[in-house]
């Protein structure tokens, strides 16, 4: 009874959790209720496609996690979806989805998604970058940790390269009290390649 008018007018319910995105579709998670409710998780991406973004919470609730990027074979791997924002008054933000892995011989890994904004609570952590191709291909960059009014989100780690290729750069730390941790750079190729750079504060 309470949700129907709000849903029709504003496109989201007054109370209730958002729906999760279906796996393999890259669909975004639904937003939670304006007053109470957590955002739904983003759906994982199909092969080579990005994961969906997590849904945002309202005043009270947790942000949905971003969906993982789809693995790449002939083409590039998909990026992870961004985490949803946490509740404005209370709630943890969603973490960014991990970048897709490269299953081919010369394909770069997908980048990790960024963490969701923290509202008044903990910010979301960045997703891990996907691993590069078995022979050639750089690791994906780690997602950035989001800013928060309390602890900032941690940056995601960069992806590891294969035999030839550079490791992905680590994600930057989110601003907060205290600040989040920076993401570590991914390891470069076993035969040739530089390690990724550590994220910045």
For the regions a language model picked out, list residue spans one by one:
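Long, compositionally biased tandem-repeat segments
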Residues: 1-201
